[in-house]
């Protein structure tokens, strides 16, 4: 009987561990064959963060402009990536803050146009184009809670929202106007603002949904051009590999997640756990 109870306890602990490993809100599959160039004026990128050292930016210059495939019409704005290089055997964590629409290298399926600070970690600028890079997505270790700003020119009948300081990318933003019972989903623009063309005077509720399906709510008293608010919470990234920590969210840190390697596949982990428990059970029976 004691053997059976021990087996059940081990089984429960194993599946609790498996469940935790599956909670990362986005895929962390390792991607190979990426390339990178660099550019020298990374401020005022297409994602709307303006000055990178300002209140909307990441607070450092370790950023990238993404080619059209990765940029995906703004859906990867604010996503952080861990990029590894065979030239230096080092890796760097960057945040996507801009798009790279050039007709050359940026048209590749996985291309990063990096700030010089990020590029220098991966290779010498004299090389020009770095080939054979690998990367995977990681959470951004930002400080504080998710924030929201209303675009300049916003008024009682039209506004647009920028969601920033989030550990993960945003799947949807919706608004419930005073007197209404339902939320209305907004359209994300290619410059990363969520457009609301049907506002009315007065307070309203905003619902922010992460790429992992988690929600954050905030009530805003009125539309006010360039007014910024901090929500009361941050999205969870439990179970993600290579979660940055410390000031600036680990951006630019060559050691952040650099030795993690390819994240484990959940189904493989499950099979491995079941196999291990079966062997353990047979040993205990003997």
Swiss-Prot record:
Membrane-spanning intervals of the chain: 266-286
As for membrane topology, the entry says: Single-pass type I membrane protein
**Family of the protein in this entry:** Belongs to the expansin family. Expansin A subfamily.
Q: Extracellular side: which ranges?
A: 22-265
What InterPro entries does the record point to? Answer: Expansin/allergen_DPBB_dom (IPR007112), Expansin_CBD_sf (IPR036749), Expansin_CellWall (IPR051477), Expansin_EXLX1-like (IPR049818), RlpA-like_DPBB (IPR009009), RlpA-like_sf (IPR036908)
Per UniProt, the keywords (alphabetical) are: Disulfide bond, Glycoprotein, Membrane, Signal, Transmembrane, Transmembrane helix
Q: What is this protein called?
A: Expansin-like protein 1
Q: Source organism lineage?
A: Eukaryota, Amoebozoa, Evosea, Eumycetozoa, Dictyostelia
List the signal peptide residues.
1-21
> Gene name on record?
expl1
Entry GO CC:
membrane
Q: Where is this protein chiefly located?
A: membrane
Disulphide bridges in this chain? 47-77, 80-140
Q: Which organism is it from?
A: Dictyostelium discoideum
Q: Where, per UniProt, does this protein localize?
A: Membrane
| Residues in Expansin-like EG45 domain copies | 44-145
């Amino acid at each position: 009987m004691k053997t059976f109870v021990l087996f059940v306890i081990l089984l429960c602990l194993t599946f609790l561990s498996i469940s935790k490993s599956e909670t990362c809100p986005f895929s962390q599959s390792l991607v190979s064959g990426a390339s990178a160039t660099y550019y020298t004026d990374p401020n005022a990128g297409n994602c709307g963060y303006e000055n990178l050292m300002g209140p909307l930016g990441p607070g450092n210059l370790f950023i990238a402009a993404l080619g059209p495939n990765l940029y995906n019409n703004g859906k990867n704005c604010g996503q952080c990536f861990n990029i590894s290089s065979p030239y230096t055997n080092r890796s760097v964590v960057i945040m996507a803050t801009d798009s790279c629409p050039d007709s050359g290298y940026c048209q590749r399926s996985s291309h990063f146009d990096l700030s010089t600070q990020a590029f220098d970690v991966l290779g010498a600028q004299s090389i020009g184009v770095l080939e054979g890079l690998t990367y995977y997505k990681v959470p951004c270790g930002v400080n504080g809670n998710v924030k929201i700003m209303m675009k300049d020119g916003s008024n009682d009948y039209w506004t647009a929202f920028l969601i920033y300081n989030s550990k993960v990318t945003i799947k949807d933003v919706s608004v419930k106007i005073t007197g209404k019972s339902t939320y209305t989903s907004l359209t994300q623009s290619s410059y990363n603002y969520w457009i609301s063309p049907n506002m009315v005077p007065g307070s309203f509720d905003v619902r922010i949904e992460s790429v992992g399906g988690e929600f954050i709510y905030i009530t805003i008293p009125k539309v006010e051009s360039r007014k910024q608010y901090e929500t009361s919470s941050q999205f969870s990234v439990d179970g993600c590999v290579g979660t940055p920590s410390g000031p600036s969210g680990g951006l630019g840190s060559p050691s952040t997640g650099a030795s993690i390697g390819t994240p484990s596949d959940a189904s493989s982990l499950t099979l491995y756990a079941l196999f291990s428990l079966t062997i353990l059970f047979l040993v205990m029976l003997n």
